[in-house]
From Swiss-Prot:
Single Gene Ontology BP annotation: translation
SUPFAM superfamilies (alphabetical): RL5-like (SSF55282)
InterPro entries tied to this protein: Ribosomal_uL5 (IPR002132), Ribosomal_uL5_bac-type (IPR020930), Ribosomal_uL5_C (IPR031309), Ribosomal_uL5_dom_sf (IPR022803), Ribosomal_uL5_N (IPR031310)
Matches recorded under Pfam families: Ribosomal_L5 (PF00281), Ribosomal_L5_C (PF00673)
Biological source species: Solibacter usitatus (strain Ellin6076)
HAMAP family from the UniProt entry: Ribosomal_uL5_B
This protein's name: Large ribosomal subunit protein uL5
Keywords: Ribonucleoprotein, Ribosomal protein, RNA-binding, rRNA-binding, tRNA-binding
Length: 180
């Protein structure tokens, strides 16, 4: 079964964007390419056990096993050695990406305290959107009793849009709650 949001994209988003930006070809309409979720754990240099919790939680949130990111070079001021684990990340594509985006927009973001919408200024100039989350507990997959420390994460939504206006229109029609 295809993801619910993929059907929404094909039936509602594509016609709306084609009308708004007057695309001549359906393939020119912007679409979600991938979603990258990254957790940076600077404290993992002192305590390596913190990394295990982050990897497990990110795996539960994303639905696939994360990759552990390692330091590319040593920095003495940060007490960091080359090759030391400093974070973890996941790249989602296809149905998993649509399911995660659906959960993010409809379940997780509304659970943020005092949530009034996400900023529309976090585009990079090429239609890609980045958002930071301070607490992983907004996702329903995380069991509150098993969390040792709250961890934030960066979520980067990569689209095929050429401009920020196209990217904003794409995400807005797919249900992303932008601040007015």
């Amino acid at each position: 079964m295809a993801a619910r949001l993929r059907e929404h994209y094909q039936t509602k988003t594509v016609p709306a964007l084609t009308k708004e930006f007057s695309y001549k070809n359906v393939m020119a309409v912007p679409k979600l390419e991938k979603i990258t979720i990254n957790i940076g754990m600077g404290e993992a240099t002192q305590n390596a056990k913190l990394m295990d919790g982050a990897v497990n939680e990110l795996g539960q949130i994303a639905g696939q096993k994360p990759v552990i990111t390692k330091a590319t070079k040593s920095i003495a001021q940060f007490k960091l050695r080359e090759g030391q684990a400093i974070g973890c990340m996941v790249t989602l594509r296809g149905d998993r990406m649509f399911e995660f985006f659906d959960r993010l927009v409809n379940v997780a973001l509304p659970r943020v305290r005092d949530f009034r919408g996400v900023s529309s200024k976090s585009f990079d100039g090429r239609g890609n959107y980045t958002l930071g989350i301070k607490d992983q507990l907004i996702f329903p997959e995380i069991d509150y009793s098993k969390v040792d420390k709250t961890k934030g994460m960066n979520i980067c939504i990569t689209t095929t849009a050429r401009t920020d206006a196209e990217g904003l229109a794409l995400l807005r029609t797919m249900g992303m709650p932008f601040r007015q």
